Each structure stands twice: as structure tokens, then as C-alpha cells.
Amino acid sequence: MCGVVGAFVFVNSRFSVTVPYLERMRDTMVHRGPDGAGVWISPDARVGLGHRRLSIVDLSDAAAQPMANADGTLLVSFNGEIYNHAAIRKDLERTGRYRWKTDHSDTEVILHAFAEWGIECLERFRGMFAFALWDQARRELWLVRDRIGVKPLYYSVHHGRIVFASEIKALLEDPDQARAVHPEAFYHYLSFLTTPAPQTMFDGISKLAAGTWLRVRDSGSIEEHCYWDVWDRAEPLDSASEGEIRERLIASLRESVSLRKVSDVPVGVFLSGGIDSSTNTALFSEGEAGPVRTFSIGYEGDHASYRNELYYARRMAAQVGAEHHERLLNADELIDFLPTMVLLQDEPIADPVCFPVYCVSKLARENGVIVCQVGEGADELFCGYPLWKTTLALQRWSDWPVPAVLKRLGLSALRLAGRDRSPRYEWLRRSAEGEPVFWSGAEAFTEAHKQRLIARDFRRKIEARSSWEALQPVRRRFDEAAWDRSGLNWMTYADLRLRLPELLLMRVDKMSMGASLEARVPFLDHKFVELAMSIPTRIKIGDGRLKYLLKKAVRGLIPEELIDRPKQGFGVPVHEWFFGRLGERTRAELDRFCRDTGYFDRREVFRLIDAGAGVQVWYLLNFALWWRAYVAR
């Protein structure tokens, strides 16, 4: 896990890439790579690559980056891991065409794989990655993001050059980079708690979508291509029995966990006590000579909105004989963390779970662990959220042949009753407009509520009529390519394309890297995802219980009481904390923000605060703090 940065100057520009220019951007990301740093600049000063190193695989100086091949025609700056690099290296060694300068660097495998197979080498990579590769012979720059979007990559095209980095804050060190809010990204943030790729909250800065590459030529032409989509790989398992599918799932997940143990530094597991992290822990412990190291977070005191899961984490740790570590957090620590949080986020990631993710990452580092496996992805692949069951029922109702005129009459009645901010109104509106009920596994504000929340003058700057516009390309692809266009498959696919890569995985990446720790995600190995999306809906949800199939697959692997207890999820008791210092800080910050800017309607903001809408208020606070740190400075 590292930090990537660089620039490529087009033929119509006189700009020159210099060492101070690259180092200034690179060293905003020291936390991503505290173990070393490097810079390479082409002789004509038209191309530059920089790198911050967190040493994990092949710790030798020979594996430092940016790395060039033997004749200097290919150079790469790489963030992430290629878990199957040893197998690919053997294939390349058999050709006899390549000289190797490292013992087992996956970075060098990328260089020689590209030389051998071109960009099609991505088909062979199994891992999480974001990299920039310069092809000197063709004068082409390649920017690549992994299939699921575990690793980020941002870029900006301005003043005759493209500048790119693992973090936005690096791009902002370019003296010609503007700092302005993207109006439509802001509008979509209020729905999705994040911004949909390729947008970021910064006007003029883009992020590479998951499973996508860019090819940039010195003329300034940019070609974008989606090289992976799950519907190109999922093959329906219609003839397989439920038992056979369960066996395949566990075998695939066992392989995924095993691949993510490959490291030259200590590896541990984040353990919440839920099914996903407990399954990771059980599989990780198999074949280990020593105890697996596990890390958990809880909260001081009792909270109605979030109950500590430490009992279950300890229960799982004891079963596998883990070396278990845990820490209790409180509201004062969250308040103190807010400035660091928004700086690490780069753009608002409106999820208070950023706080415990950072703290558990720091706990692992303090105990000598550099890499941890995490449980993201299982809920989306196996219907793990209570809201999903409700949404599936609502979608079935929406599909009934009820005339649209009757649905619109219902909307009018709800408006007259002052209920147009409610989820019920939004669900009915989507049904009347022919939109799917489900947009995302996490939604902040309805379309009608956003119209009240956003200040009138700022609304005029927003061209989008609805945040459905951000999802329409995803829906078109689903309708064209999905082998089974069930409601459940749509929900999973929508979250694979937006919520996972741009919200859940970014909170993990930004916060873990803020503590200089690498996070690996076994449930989102692309082979496992392809298998999960090949399972018929009737088998995946069985009798209708949440995570029906996964629960049956892991019985005997983890304690029964962990499997059968109600779903809770990894959270933060912000509702209660808003009644103390956090609430005072929030009222003051949002009052100041509303008076200084024209983004929100102040009356609507304080209506939410007075109503105790803690989580929604958090989304607004996150944006206000980010704006002050990144835009108003």
C-alpha cells in the first residue's frame, strides 16, 4: 500500500515537471508511505512519477518505486497488491525474455506483464491496485484502477497537462489547480453520502471509476475503457444444488483469505463480532503456526442506538485462540478527531464509521501489525441489511400494474399532509416515475427534502433534476447485461458500482492509510464476487432470512450464537453523542457555515437539529467541516 503521484505534459504546453513540483504533491501523502519515497522525471521534463512507499512485499531497496524495466522503456508507480504475483512471475520466467532485479516484487511483475501482454495483463491480476504506467516507446500514460475499486486514483486535466495521485490533497498542491465545489457532485452527495465516479466534490478533479483504465497520449487525447464488469463474468448456477453452492462459496472464500495473508510484514484481522469478520478470522487462523492477531473497537457506556459487540468479538477470538486487542472510544475523542478526519477524507465521506475505522487501524499499528483483513462486501453480496428486505417488498408492490395517475394522486395527498420529506413519499415518487425503488444501500435525503435543504440561490447552479441521473448508466448496463434482472441483483449491482467503491471502501482506504496500515478485503476478491453474482436469487435468500446462504455456509466454522443473533453492523452512537459536546460543536459549526455560505437553508438545517436527526445532521456537519478545511482556506 503506497501513494502514487505524477504528471504528463501535452505537446501544446511549455510546462516542465520538476523535482520540487512532484515532491510537494507526493509528500502530502507521507501517511500512505512512511517507509520511503522516490521521484522519476523524463529527460525532456514532460513526464514525472512520484511514490511514497509502505513496504509490505519484498522489503528490499531493489523494490523501491517508481520502478523501471531493464531498458527503461516502461516505468510504473503502483499502490496496492497483486496477490497472485508469484504465479504470474513463473509464467513470465518461462518465456526467458525478462531480466529480474528483485526477488519477489509484485511491482516488477506489473512491468514485465505489461511488456508481455499489454494492457490485457490486467486479466491476469488478482488483487487491489491503482497504478500509473508510462510507456516511453509509445509515449502513452496508462492510469488503472482495480475491478472493485478498493484503491483510489484521482486526476485533473488543466493547463496542458494531466496530473494524477492517490489522494486529492496531492493534486491541490499544483499551483494551477482550482478549489471549487462541483454543484452536481454536491447534489448527489446529499443522496449517496459520497460522490459518484467520475465526479469528485472538486470541480475539475475526477476519480477513475472501478474496473476502468485511461490511456493518455501526448496530444492530450484521453481514452477511457471499462475493462471489467461482473455481468461479463457471472455464469448462472441454475443446475447446482444449494449444498454444492455452499461448498464452492467456502472454498472460494478460503482461497481469497489465504491469498490476502501473503506479506513480508505482520498481518491481522479486524474483528467486530459479526458474521463477516468472524468468518475472516476463522479462515485466517487455519494453518497458522501462531495465533491470529485480532483488533476490535467498542464505546464507553451504554447506548440505545448502538450496542457494543465486544462480547461476540471476544467469543470468536477465544474460539481460534487469537491474540486479541480492543479499545473503547468516547465522544470527546471523536470531536478531537474531526479535523484529522476531514483532511484524510479528501472529499466528504459522510459515514461516522470513519472514526472507529481509523482508531482500530491505529490500534493495529501500535501492536506491530501493518496489514489487516476487513469484512466489507458480504452484506451487499448476500442481502445482509434489514432495509433490503423492506425494499424488495416495496419493489414488488411498485411492480403491480397500478396506473401512474393513481400513484400521482397519492403523491399529492402526501404533499398536502406535509409528508413530502418522508421515505414513503420518495418510494411512491420513484414508482410513479418508473424508477427502481432502490438507489443505494445508504441514502441521506430524498429528492423533495433536498429541494428544501439546499439554499434557493445555490439550487439554480445545479443542472441535475434528480440524483437518479447518476445511476441511469448503471441501470442501463444492468438491463442490458444481467443474466437475472431480479430486485436483489439490481441492489447488489448498484452498490457494487457506487456505494462500495466510493463510500465503504474509501472510508476503509482513507482511514486505514491515515494510520499507515494496509486493509485487504477478502469478500471482494473479484473471483468471489463473480461467483456470488452467479447464484440464483431463490438460493441466495432461501427462506427470506438475512444472509440466508452465507449463514448456512459458515455453520460449523464460527459459533452458532454469532450466526443467529440479530444483525447490528459496525456503527457509532452519534445520536446520543449529539446531546453532549458534539451537539454543541455541531450547532455552532453549522450556524457559522450557513451564515458564511449559500449552500444550505439555515431554517431547514436547524429543524433537523431540533428534531434530533443525528445521522442526517452528521452528513451536513461533515460537508461543512470539509468545506472549511479544503475550500475556504
Regions found by a protein language model. Name each.
Residues 369-379, 383-385:
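Short acidic/histidine-rich active-site segments
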Residues 380-408:
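A mobile, often basic/glycine-rich helix-loop segment
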Residues 1-4, 10, 24, 43, ...:
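Adenosyl-5′-phosphate
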Residues 1-345, 357, 361, 555-562, ...:
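Cysteine-centered catalytic environments shared across enzyme families
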Residues 339-343, 366, 387-390, 577-579:
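Short low-complexity, flexible loop/linker segments enriched in glycine and/or proline
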Residues 105-109, 276, 330-334, 356, ...:
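Short, conserved alpha-helical segments within structured domains
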Residues 373, 413-417:
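Gly/Ser/Thr-rich phosphate-binding loop
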Residues 347-353:
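Short, flexible loop segments at the rims of nucleotide/cofactor-binding pockets, characterized by
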